[in-house]
Design a protein with these regions (language model features):
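Hydrophobic membrane-insertion alpha-helices, especially the h-region
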Residues: 7-28
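Alpha-helical transmembrane signal-anchor/signal-peptide segments
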Residues: 29-50
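Loop/turn elements at helix/coil->beta-strand transitions in domains of secreted/extracellular proteins
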Residues: 51-53, 77-78, 104-107, 231-237, ...
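Membrane-embedded segments
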Residues: 57, 61-145
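Extracytoplasmic/secreted proteins, especially bacterial periplasmic and envelope-associated proteins
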Residues: 66, 91-94, 136-139, 143, ...
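Secreted/periplasmic serine-hydrolase-like ester/acetyl group-modifying domain
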Residues: 125-232
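Extended hydrophobic/aromatic segments used for targeting, binding, or gating
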Residues: 217, 223-224, 230-232, 237-293
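Histidine-centered active-site loop/cap adjacent to the catalytic His
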Residues: 288-319
Length: 319
């Protein structure tokens, strides 16, 4: 009788264990494996608590162009790129909120390129890349909701639990879905190297002085980032890394420079527009770009040698 009871209990438990294992493996295979957003956040959680000196925020302009390895080699700076492709400022804000649950960096470096965003809601790919790596939390929930229009708020749960959004990927599976190595992002500290070379024409924008307004929602969340950093007493180094800047973008960043004058010293904000420092960096437009938006390894080296020296000179991380 006792054996029958044990068998009666163990059979369903065994079935549940097998089912759980199968679902976990299925989830692993079907899940999105973007290494330009999701992996950066997933590997961030594996960093030792309070081990990050410099938290890098932004879009691909940040995670392709800022190399934590060079910052460490040149200045002993422990940096991590917590970024995602095409990331609007509302998702960046919630990335920062989430990061502060686990780390208290001594400096935030934020690339400002996405201030050119004029849409009020996230594109599907940007929403996924900016939220799917996050643990289940209020920050993830609010980030998803911020990225959806009022008419789509009822869909937020799909992105919160993730699986419903990618359960139909069976026909799209490739070999990479079974062997994808997410751990490399932990080793690269969120950096995404690009090695190709694409000759570019140097932008000539020195005479562009007009200003174009920054989208209200984009600016509101950017301000929240600065306010949160101030509350946490973390200085902010805003950067505009080298890319082939358009006249329209230049007018947006002229507006940014005007707005930043309204922030007093208590915010500890510094802004460097590297698009005005091509010669100082030694940028070669024939050899240092991968495409219109990103430097290649040669250009990245030049940018990060400068950045490491600047951080060492202007910020004291102590011990």
């Amino acid at each position: 009788m006792t054996n029958k009871i044990i068998t009666y209990i163990l059979k369903p438990l065994g079935f549940l264990a097998i089912l759980t294992f199968v679902l976990i493996q299925l989830n692993r295979v079907l899940s999105f494996k973007y290494d330009d957003g999701i992996c950066q956040m997933e590997q961030f959680y594996k960093q030792e608590e309070n081990s990050i000196d410099v938290l890098v925020l932004g879009s691909s302009h940040a995670f392709v162009n800022i190399n934590p390895q060079i910052l460490y080699e040149q200045g002993g700076i422990q940096a991590y790129n917590l970024c995602a492709s095409m990331q609007p400022t509302w998702h960046t804000y919630y990335y920062l909120k989430e990061a502060l649950e686990y780390q208290h960096p001594k400096l935030i470096v934020m690339d400002v390129f996405r201030l050119v965003e004029n849409a009020d809601y996230s594109k599907e790919t940007a929403l996924i890349k900016s939220t799917y790596g996050m643990k289940l939390s209020s920050n993830k929930w609010e980030s998803i909701r911020a990225g959806l229009s009022r008419e789509r708020q009822s869909e937020a749960y799909i992105y919160l639990f993730e699986f419903p959004a990618y359960h139909g990927r069976y026909e799209d599976l490739t070999r990479e879905d079974f062997v994808f190595d997410k751990e490399k992002m932990e080793n690269y500290k969120g950096f995404y190297p690009v090695s190709k070379v694409a000759p570019m024409k140097r932008p000539e924008l020195e005479n562009i002085t007009e200003c174009t307004p920054i989208s209200q929602k984009t600016w509101d969340y950017f301000q929240q980032i600065l306010e949160l950093a101030k509350t946490e007493e973390i200085p902010v180094l805003l950067v505009n890394v080298p890319y082939i800047q358009s006249e329209a973008d230049k007018k947006i960043f002229n507006t940014l420079e005007e707005h930043l004058q309204n922030y007093d010293a208590s915010y500890q904000i510094t802004y460097i527009d590297f698009n005005q420092k091509y010669d100082e960096l030694g940028i070669d437009f024939d050899t240092d770009y991968a495409d219109y938006d990103h430097l290649n390894e040669s250009g990245v080296d030049k940018l990060n040698y400068y950045l490491a020296e600047f951080i060492k000179e202007h910020y004291d991380f102590g011990s």
